[in-house]
């Protein structure tokens, strides 16, 4: 029995924040079953990973893509378990072309100006004979690179595709490893006007009611779509990236220890979809925004999470991945996922201007700006505005 390591290796997001006025013409599309299934899976996986304390960041689209390629080579009950766990459509005969179509849509205009989005796949052959039809399928539908190599070749591919942000993904490979399936997402988004560094000040971030850390907090005042839900005790803010194709969605509980109170917003795909729709139709309001400057790095062995979600046979010697090599001698030994997120003031050349505003006395002023003070734990998503695909999601509990 040979094995193969499924390395869902890297989801990198170098997100450089700045302010941009959102447009009111966000393009809407009919949500397809693949997007809905991917969102449902993202929230299931989040529920598994969130049990650990601390910060959390991962790319559900990266995980779904890599396992989508693996699913294409699964057969019988192994395939059924993968389909159910990943929330793929019950009729998955068109899954590969649907993934191709969705990825192409996500990449459309993805590298225009200061926005960069790369989604890349690969199959590294270490010792196995792989079916030509499987390799052809990966090339045709996932635009996968196919090459032979060892752990050094794999790590070099990782370093190249992530622009050096992740120098390695694996320390070693078992001599029984047959092949490694790879997926990487690299994202760099900036805004037209960055946060001014002069307005970044060290201030408390409250980890709990009794504990806090002093961290750099960025500040700006601008118009953004904002929802204040007093009944469920949270605020949600949508920060569009330049080009208005991708957005950063923040969900901030009113209470410092209130992350559980916003659970209903992310308990299933329908509830999250409803919130995203509300955000995209919410009128822009003047917002005084305070956001921590931070960097997140995550490294997950996802096998335990998938087993808890009901996927078992794929990790056993009885697994059926005969669609990959024509035999029943492959099983998954490892699912490794790394993710990096950077948020700071940089991302574009900045210009400065000074305005001296002379006001007449007794002029009726507009309403004061709303406050969005992200000085305690919050949830966040990086999503595509048109398809509502979740590229990245996470939880910030300590930016220090």
Task: Report the location of each language-model feature.
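C-terminal soluble interaction/assembly domains
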Residues: 334-400
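A generic structural signal for residues located within well-ordered alpha-helices
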Residues: 37, 61, 176-177, 374
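Non-catalytic, conformational "gating/processing" segments within enzyme and secreted inhibitor domains
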Residues: 53, 92-262, 275-364
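Proline-rich low-complexity regions
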Residues: 5, 60, 253-256, 290-292, ...
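Detector for small/aliphatic-rich hydrophobic stretches
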Residues: 1-12, 16-148, 385, 396
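Well-ordered, non-membrane alpha-helical segments in soluble/globular domains
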Residues: 269-272
